[in-house]
């Protein structure tokens, strides 16, 4: 049996500075990222509830965004805090986290 599609799963995402149920997280079809594949992201591993080199990832996310001329409205500290809270909220120990 196939796993449930990502849009139809229980869970949470951190979006626009707040936690949103995964099923309610929506991105507008006319967003720049959809039309031009303009996005930056970091793929991060968490072990025992701790993201490996979380701050390095958050700072690199900011640097990547700057290269493409994007502004990120959240400081690296806020992004780190949100990632940590999300892992706890989801009850994950070992996980893959993608900040974008």
Predicted features and spans:
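Conserved alpha/beta cores of soluble small-molecule-handling proteins
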Residues: 1-100
């Amino acid at each position: 049996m196939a796993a449930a599609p990502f849009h139809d799963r229980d869970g949470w995402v951190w979006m626009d500075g707040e936690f949103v149920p995964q099923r309610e997280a929506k991105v507008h079809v006319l967003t720049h990222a959809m039309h031009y594949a303009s996005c930056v992201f970091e793929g991060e591993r968490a072990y025992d509830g701790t993201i490996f080199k979380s701050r390095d990832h958050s700072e690199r996310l900011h640097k990547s965004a700057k290269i493409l001329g994007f502004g990120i409205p959240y400081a690296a500290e806020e992004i780190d805090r949100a990632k940590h809270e999300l892992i706890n909220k989801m009850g994950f120990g070992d996980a893959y986290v993608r900040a974008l």
